[in-house]
């Protein structure tokens, strides 16, 4: 579970900061939720949770529901947020985010 790696308090604060539509910023979210300071293995575990179909990639539909992995009551990302997040993470242009791309995104 996310709370095995991240504190419930940090998750709540990070989610509160992006409640409004189009207010999501991956850099500030990763920082607030405490992901930035985690080890490579811990970030891989989080990636595994986000990769809901276990394909080895986070696809656009999974990215849209990104916040709901942290709390079931969180909102879905807007189309604009999802596209911006994907564009930032998908460095090889294949339309999805792999584990190495996710690591780079978290540390950005």
Curated annotation (Swiss-Prot):
MF-aspect GO terms: calcium ion binding
Domain of life: Eukaryota
Annotated signal peptide: none
PROSITE patterns: EF_HAND_1 (PS00018), EF_HAND_2 (PS50222)
Sorted UniProt keywords: Calcium, Metal-binding, Muscle protein, Repeat
GO cellular component, as recorded: cytoplasm
Binding site for Ca(2+) 2: 90, 92, 94, 96, 101
Family: Belongs to the parvalbumin family.
Role played: In muscle, parvalbumin is thought to be involved in relaxation after contraction. It binds two calcium ions.
Protein's name according to its UniProt entry: Parvalbumin beta
